[in-house]
C-alpha cells in the first residue's frame, strides 16, 4: 500500500502543468511582499516579441519537463522491475533456505542414526573379539587333548607294529622249518636208495609218524578253528563298531580299545600256537634225524612219505592262507582306525562348534545359571555318563585348589596358574 501511494505521489509530481494557470505562473508570481509581480513590459512595440519569446521558453520548458517525466517514468519502471526481481530472488533464496534447513535437519538425523550404528558396530566388534578369544582358548585346550590322544594312538600303533614284526619273525621261522623239511625230504630220498632193511621197524616208525601227523592235523584244525573264531570276532567287532559309532562316538573309543586288546590277545594266542607248532616241527626233525639211518625205499614208506608231503603242502598252504587273512584283517583294522580317527575329528569339530554356538547364545541372551558340568566338556562325557548324576565332578586346580564350575574354566585357570 505504501508502495502504491508513493508511486501516485511521484506521478503527480512529474505531471506537466499546462493551460492558463501555468501561463499565469510563468508570467507572474507573488512577490515576497504579497503583491503580484508584474512583468515590466516595454512599450507596445516590444510586447508581442516578448510574449512570443516567453511562449517559446514556456514550450521549451514543457518539452524539458516532458522529457524529464519520461526519463523518470523509465527509471520508475526500471525500479519496479528491479524490486520485482529482488522479490523473486528473495523468494527463491527463502525457498533455498527452507530446503537447506530441511537438508540440515535430515543430515542431523542421519548423523544420529550413523552414530547409533557405529556404537552398535563397536559393541558387535567387542563381542566378536571376546568370541575370538574364547575360540582361541578352546582351540588350545582341544589341541592339548588331541596331542594326548595322538600320543596314545602312536603308542598303540608302535605296539601293533611290534606284534606284526614278531608275527613276521614267526613266519620266517616257519619258512625256515619248511626249508629244513625239504632238505630232510631230499635226504630221505638219498637214504631211500641206500637202505632196504628193517621194514617192521619202519612200519612202527610210520605209525609213530602217522600219530605225529594226526597230532599235526589236530593242531592245524585247532588253528583253523581259532582262525574262524577270530574272523567271527572280527565281524562281530566290526558290527559292534558300526552300531557303536551310530549310538556314541565317544564311547566307541574305549570299546575299540578293549576290542583292540582282545585282538592283541588273539594274536598272542595265534603266536603261541605257532610256537607250539614250531616245537612239534623241531621234535619231528629230531625224530627224523634219529631214524635217518634206518629209512629205506619201500612202497609203504614211500606212500606214507607222499601222504606226509601232501599233508605238509596242505598245511603250508593253510598257513599261507592264514597269513593272507591275517594281513587282510590287519588292513581292515588300519582302515577302521583311520575311519575312527576321521569320525573322532569330526565329532570333536562338531562338539566345538556346538559349544561355541551355545556360548554365543549365552552371551547374547540374559545371564543364566551355570550349566551342569557334564555339558561343558564334550571329551569328559563318557566317564560322566557312567558316574551317578547325584555326584557332581570335582574340577579342582592341583596347584592352588581352585574350584572351577566346568572343565573349560579349569583348563584356562590351570594354564594361567602354571604361567
Swiss-Prot record:
Entry annotated with the keyword Signal: no
- UniProt xrefs under InterPro entries: CC2-LZ_dom, NEMO_N, NEMO_ZF, Optineurin/NFkB_EssMod
* Chain residues that bind Zn(2+): 397, 400, 413, 417
The molecular function terms in GO held by this entry are:
identical protein binding; K63-linked polyubiquitin modification-dependent protein binding; linear polyubiquitin binding; polyubiquitin modification-dependent protein binding; protein domain specific binding; protein heterodimerization activity; protein homodimerization activity; signaling adaptor activity
Region of interest: Interaction with CYLD: 382-419
Query: Which parts of this chain are annotated as the region Required for interaction with TNFAIP3?
Result: 251-419
Q: One GO term of the cellular component aspect?
A: IkappaB kinase complex
Effect of mutating residue 301 to A: Impairs tandem ubiquitin binding
Q: Where do we see the Glycyl lysine isopeptide (Lys-Gly) (interchain with G-Cter in ubiquitin and interchain with MARCHF2) cross-link in this protein?
A: 326
Question: What's this protein's name?
Answer: NF-kappa-B essential modulator
Amino acid at each position: 500500500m505504501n508502495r502504491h501511494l508513493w508511486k501516485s505521489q511521484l506521478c503527480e509530481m512529474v505531471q506537466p502543468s499546462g493551460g492558463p494557470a501555468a501561463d499565469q505562473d510563468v508570467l507572474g508570481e507573488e512577490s515576497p511582499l504579497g503583491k503580484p509581480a508584474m512583468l515590466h513590459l516595454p512599450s507596445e512595440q516590444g510586447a508581442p516579441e516578448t510574449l512570443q519569446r516567453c511562449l517559446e521558453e514556456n514550450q521549451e520548458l514543457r518539452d524539458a519537463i516532458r522529457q524529464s517525466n519520461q526519463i523518470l517514468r523509465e527509471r520508475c519502471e526500471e525500479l519496479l522491475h528491479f524490486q520485482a526481481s529482488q522479490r523473486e530472488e528473495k523468494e527463491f533464496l527463502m525457498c533455498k533456505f527452507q530446503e537447506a534447513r530441511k537438508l540440515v535437519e535430515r543430515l542431523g538425523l542421519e548423523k544420529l542414526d550413523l552414530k547409533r550404528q557405529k556404537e552398535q558396530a563397536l559393541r558387535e566388534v567387542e563381542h566378536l573379539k571376546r568370541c575370538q578369544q574364547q575360540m582361541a582358548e578352546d582351540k588350545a585346550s582341544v589341541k592339548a587333548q588331541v596331542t594326548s590322544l595322538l600320543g596314545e594312538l602312536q603308542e598303540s600303533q608302535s605296539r601293533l607294529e611290534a606284534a606284526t614284526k614278531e608275527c613276521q619273525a614267526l613266519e620266517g621261522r616257519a619258512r625256515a622249518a619248511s626249508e629244513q623239511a625239504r632238505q630232510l625230504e631230499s635226504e630221505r630220498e638219498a637214504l631211500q636208495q641206500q637202505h632196504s632193511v628193517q621194514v617192521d621197524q619202519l612200519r612202527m616208525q610210520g605209525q609213530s609218524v602217522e600219530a605225529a601227523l594226526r597230532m599235526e592235523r589236530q593242531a592245524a584244525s585247532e588253528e583253523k578253528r581259532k582262525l574262524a573264531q577270530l574272523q567271527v570276532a572280527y565281524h562281530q567287532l566290526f558290527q559292534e563298531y558300526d552300531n557303536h559309532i551310530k549310538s556314541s562316538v565317544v564311547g566307541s573309543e574305549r570299546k575299540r580299545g578293549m576290542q583292540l586288546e582282545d585282538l592283541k590277545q588273539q594274536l598272542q594266542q595265534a603266536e603261541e600256537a605257532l610256537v607250539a607248532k614250531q616245537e612239534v616241527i623241531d621234535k619231528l626233525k629230531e625224530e627224523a634225524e634219529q631214524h635217518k639211518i634206518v629209512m629205506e625205499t619201500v612202497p609203504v614208506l614211500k606212500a606214507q612219505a607222499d601222504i606226509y608231503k601232501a599233508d605238509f603242502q596242505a598245511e603250508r598252504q593253510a598257513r599261507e592262507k592264514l597269513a593272507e587273512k591275517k594281513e587282510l584283517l590287519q588292513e581292515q583294522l588300519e582302515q577302521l582306525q583311520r575311519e575312527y580317527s576321521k569320525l573322532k575329528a569330526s565329532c570333536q569339530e562338531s562338539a566345538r562348534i556346538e559349544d561355541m554356538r551355545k556360548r554365543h547364545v549365552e552371551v547374547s541372551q540374559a545371564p543364566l545359571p551355570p550349566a551342569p558340568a557334564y555339558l561343558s566338556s564334550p571329551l569328559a562325557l563318557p566317564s560322566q555318563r557312567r558316574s551317578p548324576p547325584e555326584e557332581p565332578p570335582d574340577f579342582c586346580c592341583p596347584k592352588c585348589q581352585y574350584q572351577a564350575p566346568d572343565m573349560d574354566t579349569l583348563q584356562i585357570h590351570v594354564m594361567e596358574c602354571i604361567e
